[in-house]
């Protein structure tokens, strides 16, 4: 598991696992969505519901939203590299259907990670002492929402000790945010 990971970046000994990487690409041409949906077997298009073709591939297991403008959103990848690989595969599928698609402006838009600190957390005192960063309304949502400023990451913290981190453009932001919150969480450990 930790073979090629620099553990000096993870003093807590916990490495958040990437759950979803969202990227965008510009295929650089306009697309006939109906045409794509009819020809590609892994595609669905329901313009009354959503103005994009929804296409899926198995490897890497991802979903793409392909818009008539040639813009594409790729979601579901578990790493930045998988996101790029998948986006290239979708571009190739569109090319094979006869469109002059190029692969331009690839950009990671969001990375979501999660981990488990393996101890329960006292939510109310955490929310109170860090109220400038927190919103916690357990009757609406069971998680505490912690908006970190540096790096600019949103964390969902659950009483169980599970933590979800979102809003990163690169994985190091996920790691940094977790290493910053970890000592805070240990202070609010349920005894």
Curated annotation (Swiss-Prot):
Q: Which GO terms describe its molecular function?
A: DNA binding
GO BP terms, alphabetized = DNA-templated transcription initiation
Placement of sequence repeats on the sequence: 18-94, 108-185
Q: Does the record's keyword annotation contain Transcription?
A: yes
Show the CDD domains listed in the entry. Answer: TBP_eukaryotes
Into which family does the record put it?
Belongs to the TBP family.
> What function is annotated for this protein?
General transcription factor that functions at the core of the DNA-binding multiprotein factor TFIID. Binding of TFIID to the TATA box is the initial transcriptional step of the pre-initiation complex (PIC), playing a role in the activation of eukaryotic genes transcribed by RNA polymerase II.
Q: Which HAMAP family match?
A: TATA_bind_prot_arch
| The protein's name | TATA-box-binding protein
**Native species:** Acetabularia peniculus
């Amino acid at each position: 598991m930790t073979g090629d990971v620099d553990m000096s970046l993870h003093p807590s000994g916990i490495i958040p696992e990437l759950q979803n990487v969202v990227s965008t690409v510009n295929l650089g041409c306009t697309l006939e969505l109906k045409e794509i949906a009819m020809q590609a077997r892994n595609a669905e298009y329901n313009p009354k519901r959503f103005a994009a073709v929804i296409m899926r591939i198995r490897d890497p297991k991802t979903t793409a939203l392909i818009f008539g403008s040639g813009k594409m959103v790729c979601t579901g990848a578990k790493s930045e590299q998988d996101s790029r690989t998948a986006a290239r595969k979708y571009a190739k599928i569109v090319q094979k259907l006869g469109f002059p698609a190029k692969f331009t402006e690839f950009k990671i838009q969001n990375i979501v990670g999660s981990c488990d600190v393996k101890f329960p957390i006292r939510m109310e005192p955490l929310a109170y002492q860090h109220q400038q960063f927190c919103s916690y309304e357990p009757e609406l949502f069971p998680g505490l929402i912690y908006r970190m400023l540096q790096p600019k990451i949103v964390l969902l913290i659950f009483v169980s000790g599970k933590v979800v981190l979102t809003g990163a453009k690169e994985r190091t932001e996920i790691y940094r945010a977790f290493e910053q919150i970890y000592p805070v969480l240990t202070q609010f450990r349920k005894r």
